[in-house]
Amino acid sequence: MKPFPRAEISSSALQNNLAVLRQQASRSQVMAVVKANGYGHGLLNVANCLHTADGFGLARLEEALELRAGGVKARLLLLEGFFRSTDLPLLVAHDIDTVVHHESQIEMLEQATLSKPVTVWLKVDSGMHRLGVTPEQFAQVYARLTACDNVAKPIHLMTHFACADEPENNYTQVQMQTFNQLTADLPGFRTLANSAGALYWPKSQGDWIRPGIALYGVSPVTGDCGANHGLIPAMNLVSRLIAVRDHKAGQPVGYGCYWTAKQDTRLGVVAIGYGDGYPRNAPEGTPVWVNGRRVPIVGRVSMDMLTVDLGADAADQVGDEALLWGAALPVEEVAEHIGTIAYELVTKLTPRVAVCLA
């Protein structure tokens, strides 16, 4: 018997999405972003499915070491950089690139004794104001890194967009101009584009693109859907009905008696809840896919279960599958009902959810 709840990961969908992004940015190499356990899809699962990617972007050194231990040979980049001086020998030993965004990292590089230089991507704060050296700091920082024997040459250059997922917002153009003016005529690779940049801002594509959410079949833009770009959802979050009950008009259901039936109906109880990472704040009406149709959540999501209104004439039975999001029910749609973003839904699944290649 298949486990439930489970996240079924489609290798063909992942490969399709990589191909779509390559077509969108045909002159760029692809740094597939697989941080946060491959956006909840399983780090090694995703890396193995995307073995033709030119490199992988990660948030933590531990993630990079897991990929190397799993046999991944491609370029790896720590998108937040290293955190401690003791990380540096591991970067050297395992051939891992690092972002540099802060003076403290430069000091650690200058003071380290290493067997060979580290490949560095200098992050420029072109307007997001989160990580990166400011335009005023750039020349001095670049000179220090150039003079540092522990930094491989050439130094690569990157920035990150604040509003690329708002296609009508000109701020992305401002950031591109800032970055391009600062880095004009310098050697090394350049990378600006995240998923939204790759899909909506072709002039940002550069030497490398760094797609994340789009690889998993999800649009980065609110109100949009990955299918509009030829993307296919890579995750089907599936559980099953563990009870089907006749329910009388006027009867409440669930904690707090939050919802009361207005007419006789049949309710289904689905074996998934906030203990599995399904949001407790999912409101009444959030859709679940059961036997070829959308049915609404009613009552509060509890730790292990949620309830759906199957309708008075429903023929659904205990054991029938329920799709919380996936190919038939886009995660973007579910996120919009809940008032969050698809990124949060796919990355917050807990270890109780079995992640398996379909």
Curated annotation (Swiss-Prot):
Catalyzed reactions: L-alanine = D-alanine
Entry GO CC: cytosol
Pathway: Amino-acid biosynthesis; D-alanine biosynthesis; D-alanine from L-alanine: step 1/1
GO molecular function, one term: alanine racemase activity
HAMAP family: Ala_racemase
Binding residues for substrate: 130, 303
EC number: 5.1.1.1
Protein name per Swiss-Prot or TrEMBL: Alanine racemase
Keywords linked to the UniProt accession: Isomerase, Pyridoxal phosphate
Chain positions with N6-(pyridoxal phosphate)lysine modification: 35
Required co-factors: pyridoxal 5'-phosphate
A Pfam family assignment: Ala_racemase_N
Example of a GO biological process term: D-alanine biosynthetic process
Keyword match Isomerase: yes
Family: Belongs to the alanine racemase family.
Domain of life: Bacteria
Active-site residues annotated for this sequence: 35 (proton acceptor), 255 (proton acceptor)
EC top class named in words: isomerase
